[in-house]
């Protein structure tokens, strides 16, 4: 009886194994097309060290360290605002922010920062190819007038081949800034 039971178990096990779907023991054969890298899309994520550069730049501006902020700027950098104003050259940008931080702004903080580094491989409009850092942050400023300004801002930084910032585009609402700086 034990032998019959043992034989029955073996037959049932063999039946179950033979009816089970086969596992893929072999990897599918690769072709030459599988080993070549696909062309990059028009835009892809860039390295996170660009986020660090942007974060350090804002932190330096917040503390009044204009030299630290400018450490990652190219000599030919351009700083543009959405109202059409702009500054050309590292020295002009440095002097502008030095003047603002020493004569106009008492304190400046940034919070709720969001960063997105991207590499534009195929420009779709008038943007330049290369690495861009998109950032959004809440800006809180207290001016020498005693008035305060609080608003969300959006900045876009472009990096040259040496990882230096050569373009900044800043989108902000000028009305609260004008109101806070009025005497």
Predicted regions and their residues:
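Low-complexity, intrinsically disordered terminal/linker segments enriched in charged
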Residues: 166-183
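Sec-dependent N-terminal signal peptides
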Residues: 4-13
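Surface-exposed, charged secondary-structure patches
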Residues: 97-145
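C-terminal motif of bacterial Sec signal peptides marking the signal peptidase cleavage site
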Residues: 15-18
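Short, low-complexity N-terminal intrinsically disordered segments enriched in polar/charged residues
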Residues: 20-63, 67, 71
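A short gly/proline-enriched turn/hairpin at secondary-structure junctions
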Residues: 78-88, 103, 123
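Positively charged n-region of N-terminal signal peptides that target proteins for export
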Residues: 1-5, 21
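Short, surface-exposed coil-to-beta transition loops
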Residues: 136, 149-154
């Amino acid at each position: 009886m034990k032998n019959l039971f043992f034989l029955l178990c073996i037959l049932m096990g063999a039946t179950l194994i033979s009816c089970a779907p086969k596992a893929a023991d072999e990897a599918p054969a690769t072709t030459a097309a599988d080993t070549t890298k696909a062309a990059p899309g028009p835009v892809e994520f860039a390295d996170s060290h660009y986020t660090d550069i942007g974060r350090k730049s804002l932190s330096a501006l917040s503390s009044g360290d204009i030299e630290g902020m400018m450490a990652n700027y190219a000599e030919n950098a351009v700083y543009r605002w959405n109202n059409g104003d702009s500054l050309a050259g590292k020295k002009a940008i440095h002097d502008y922010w030095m003047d603002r931080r020493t004569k106009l702004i008492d304190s400046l903080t940034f919070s709720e920062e969001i960063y997105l580094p991207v590499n534009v491989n195929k420009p779709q409009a008038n943007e330049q190819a290369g690495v861009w850092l998109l950032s959004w942050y809440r800006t809180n400023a207290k001016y020498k007038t005693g008035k305060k300004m609080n608003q969300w801002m959006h900045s876009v930084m472009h990096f040259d081949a040496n990882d230096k910032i050569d373009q900044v585009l800043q989108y902000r609402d000028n009305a609260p800034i004008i109101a806070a700086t009025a005497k």
